[in-house]
Amino acid sequence: EQVIEAPKKEIPKKVTVVMDERALLFDFDKSVVKEQYVPILRNVIDYMVANNYDVTIVGHTDSKGSESYNEKLSMRRAVSVKEKLLELGLSPDRIVGLEARGELEPVASNETEEGRAQNRRIEFNLVRRD
């Protein structure tokens, strides 16, 4: 009798979790994490713990306002998400960085309100622990 083993699924070392346009967005000029996003953040925590990941939280803005202001705003957004993740029970040592990208990496056009709304976001860069 021949036994064939299924190949083990490789867990990637680095993963960027980019939310879709309905997820983890911010109101104009705000850094408050809306309560409606708590279930998404719980899912991120569960995924990180189950797959042994640490996270860098990356904040983004739309292009309204000065570049320097938007950089600061994107950092406030990253800090706000960090605080919410800690409040929800994520171990502080799993948060390995906060980054402010400001308006420099849009995912949609800043020419429309809908596009600007999609750019006011958070991304999670996950790195597996060794």
Over which residues does each language-model region extend?
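Periplasmic OmpA-like peptidoglycan-binding domain that tethers envelope proteins to the cell wall
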Residues: 31-34, 38, 60-130
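Periplasmic peptidoglycan-binding/tethering modules of Gram-negative envelope proteins
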Residues: 1-55, 91, 128-130
